[in-house]
Amino acid sequence: MSRLPPVAARDPDRLRRGAEVLAPDARGERELDRGLEAAGIERADAYLTNVVKHFKFEERGRRRIHQTPKRFEVEACTPWLRAELEVVRPEALVLLGATAAKALLGSSFRVTQHRGEPLDSDLAPLVTATIHPSAILRAPDDRSRQEERQAFAEDLRIAARVLDPR
């Protein structure tokens, strides 16, 4: 995360065309906002981007259901992401979800085994991975969702401590 403004498409026409988005739906974005707030990170202080620079979806009625990108799509976009990170030069890099983590840390990386751990990487002084905020919404019940929210916020606090070590 750096001191640059966030990147996210808010224009519905851009969404329909498959432009870059922060989260496939507003609920996932709200979970990210909750986690950032709980960790003491201002949204304006976070630079947000995606591994795959298009929103892949399946239409179901009036809804657009997010589809996980295929491996070749991730591989095609990863050089662009690495170039983006070279320009941004973040102080801390939090990889949200398996797609981001595997794209930058390798296909064998498992978020479930290493979430919240400081990771050895040349991508930034601090690199860590956690779940994608929309995963909180897939928890089976309210209690599980609350536990996931707390764990997600704690993962983000690792980055917050690097950015403001007081």
What are these regions (language model features)?
Residues 1-166:
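A polyanion-binding, active-site-adjacent surface
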